[in-house]
């Protein structure tokens, strides 16, 4: 009984975040990139993981370009934002990223 209630609480918390949004996908790709980068530092000849990393980098690049068109914010500002997030933390938080994007949108209006 307790286990089922715990699972339902977890599923309700997961539904609060919009997992299909572009911002959430960018954050999750950034976290995956961080994990793969640390993995590749240990396993230098893991070429399959390196290829996966390059694919994820390309996907994130395309999503950032789409997001900059959608929000009418310069792509370079988004790239600087991602670089700042990559340098400051090992894990990027969705809510912080969303707030920073909203701040950039307000600047351009």
From Swiss-Prot:
Which GO cellular component terms, listed alphabetically, does the Swiss-Prot or TrEMBL entry include? chloroplast; ribonucleoprotein complex; ribosome
Which GO terms fall under biological process for this protein?
translation
Q: Which domain of life is it from?
A: Eukaryota
Coiled-coil segments: none
Location relative to the cell: Plastid, Chloroplast
Give the matching Gene3D superfamilies.
S15/NS1, RNA-binding (1.10.287.10)
What are the record keywords, sorted?
Answer: Chloroplast, Plastid, Ribonucleoprotein, Ribosomal protein
> Which InterPro entries does the record associate with it?
EF_hand_dom, Ribosomal_uS15, Ribosomal_uS15_bac-type, uS15_NS1_RNA-bd_sf
Where mainly located?
plastid
Name the Gene Ontology molecular function terms of this record.
calcium ion binding; structural constituent of ribosome
Is Plastid among this UniProt entry's keywords?
yes
* The keyword Metal-binding belongs to this UniProt entry's keyword annotation: no
What protein family is recorded?
A: Belongs to the universal ribosomal protein uS15 family.
- Subunit structure of this entry? Part of the 30S ribosomal subunit.
Check the record and name the NCBIfam families matching this protein. S15_bact
**Full protein name:** Small ribosomal subunit protein uS15c
């Amino acid at each position: 009984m307790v286990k089922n209630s715990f699972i339902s609480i977890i599923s309700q918390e997961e539904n609060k975040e919009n997992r299909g949004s572009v911002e959430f996908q960018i954050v999750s790709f950034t976290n995956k990139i961080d994990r793969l980068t640390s993995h590749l530092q240990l396993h230098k000849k893991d070429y399959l993981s390196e290829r996966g990393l390059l694919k994820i980098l390309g996907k994130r690049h395309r999503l950032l370009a789409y997001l900059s068109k959608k929000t009418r914010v310069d792509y370079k500002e988004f790239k600087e934002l991602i670089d700042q997030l990559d340098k400051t933390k090992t894990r990027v938080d969705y809510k912080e990223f969303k707030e920073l994007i909203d701040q950039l949108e307000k600047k351009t209006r």
